[in-house]
């Protein structure tokens, strides 16, 4: 049985917010430089996307659609539009705060930090994934551990370990960035060094002259055959977005 939305069920990589062009990385770039450039281009200055999310479980498959708006590094709104049981559920990231709206409760709730690692909408993504760039860059120390060639691209593999005393979920992350700026995969390890899950860019297309991961999949290692896949239906970048969009009032009562 799939979980219905509640403050305990959280969000994904926002379905396909853009990973834009990263200038070809060089050995002169530090691991942090490579990651920062990739994350800076993840959403452009602003973005709007329509995406679908497929949650595959042993007892069935669930499909949802959503709209996502982003502005800068710290503003994002995700609003589910279908199916009817999920329509109206929404998540707002504003700075370091994350809010959720459940239309059945007609209430906006600010998530505590302890809830950020929980499942979003019953998927394999979490609210923690919303604030990927800010938390990864600031909370971890980054080392370029490998450069390899694959599919006509150089792949820069970066190991990120948490800074001493910083409260984080993961004991380590391994991130791979292509030389064109696509975040190719992310591996997540627990505190004892065991890999827990992996997110991969499974399909990459060129949109507006940019390499764009139109299909991203999260898989949990101890759940073979199960996954959550986010597929981009349409997207646009560097657009004007009114400031009211990223407010708690609009989260609860969206304007047309």
Where in the sequence are the language-model features?
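Solvent-exposed coil/turn segments that connect beta secondary-structure elements
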Residues: 54, 71-73, 81-83, 96-97, ...
């Amino acid at each position: 049985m799939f979980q219905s939305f509640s403050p305990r069920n959280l969000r994904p990589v926002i379905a396909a917010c853009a990973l834009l062009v990263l200038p070809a990385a060089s050995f002169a770039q530090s691991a942090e430089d490579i990651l920062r450039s990739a994350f800076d281009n993840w959403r452009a200055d602003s973005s709007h996307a329509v995406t679908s999310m497929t949650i595959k479980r042993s007892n069935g498959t669930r499909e949802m659609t959503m709209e996502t708006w982003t502005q800068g590094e710290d503003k994002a709104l995700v609003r589910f539009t279908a199916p009817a049981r999920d329509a109206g559920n929404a998540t707002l990231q504003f700075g370091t705060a994350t809010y959720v709206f459940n239309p059945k409760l007609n209430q906006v709730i600010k998530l505590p930090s302890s809830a950020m690692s929980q499942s979003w909408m019953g998927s394999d993504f979490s609210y923690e994934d919303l604030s990927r760039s800010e938390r990864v860059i600031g909370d971890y120390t980054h080392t370029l551990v490998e450069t390899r060639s694959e599919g006509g691209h150089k792949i820069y593999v970066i190991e990120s370990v948490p800074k001493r005393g910083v409260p984080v979920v993961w004991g380590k992350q391994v991130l791979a960035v292509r030389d064109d700026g696509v975040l190719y995969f992310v591996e997540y390890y627990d505190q004892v060094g065991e890999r827990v899950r992996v997110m991969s860019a499974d399909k990459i297309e060129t949109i507006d002259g940019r390499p764009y991961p139109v299909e991203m999949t999260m898989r949990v290692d101890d759940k073979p055959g199960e996954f959550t896949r986010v597929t981009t239906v349409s997207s646009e970048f560097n657009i004007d977005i009114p400031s009211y969009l990223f407010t708690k009032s609009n989260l609860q009562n969206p304007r047309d």
